């Protein structure tokens, strides 16, 4: 199965490597024609305002919103999650795709120097804790009724699912643990 990584900015190579390790074909997505080729898409972390500018420059902004509305499975990490959110509490003027019913706070867990790692309980992927890496991570402050919380940190959601959308505040691509990427492939994209 061909799974894309939105390839305009962020942890692109790391996600491509994880897709390959799950036994699927990775594709670096930089155009609408490449977007049309994939069975699922990963939106990496990076800097959300830069990502918006580049997505619009390469005509991916509206195409991605339409693809997600049409059922394209998406997994978004960190800044990717910010782009999907319905609302950014501390930057209300920032545009989003608005397809995930959450309200987030950018850099909610602190700036770069406040980055940290912690073990998370994620029952959907097994009993062994997942070592999560948070880098300038957003906090999910509110979730709509259609959003399922898969994991929390200090009572705040950090891994959520809504239909064919999976999103995390943390960066599983920076670990060697494939379980979240495998969950995306098996449970969100499903079998073709």
Swiss-Prot record:
GO BP terms: glutamine catabolic process; pyridoxal phosphate biosynthetic process; pyridoxine metabolic process
Record's keyword annotation contains Nucleotide-binding: no
One GO location term (cellular component): glutaminase complex
Keywords recorded for this protein, A-Z: Glutamine amidotransferase, Hydrolase, Lyase, Pyridoxal phosphate
Residues annotated to bind L-glutamine: 46-48, 106, 135-136
Ribonucleoprotein found in the keyword field: no
Highest taxon of source: Bacteria
Enzyme active site: 78 (nucleophile), 171 (charge relay system), 173 (charge relay system)
GO terms for MF: glutaminase activity; pyridoxal 5'-phosphate synthase (glutamine hydrolysing) activity
Catalysis performed (reactions): aldehydo-D-ribose 5-phosphate + D-glyceraldehyde 3-phosphate + L-glutamine = pyridoxal 5'-phosphate + L-glutamate + phosphate + 3 H2O + H(+); L-glutamine + H2O = L-glutamate + NH4(+)
Self-association state and partner proteins as the record states: In the presence of PdxS, forms a dodecamer of heterodimers. Only shows activity in the heterodimer.
Protein name as it appears in the record: Pyridoxal 5'-phosphate synthase subunit PdxT
Gene field: pdxT
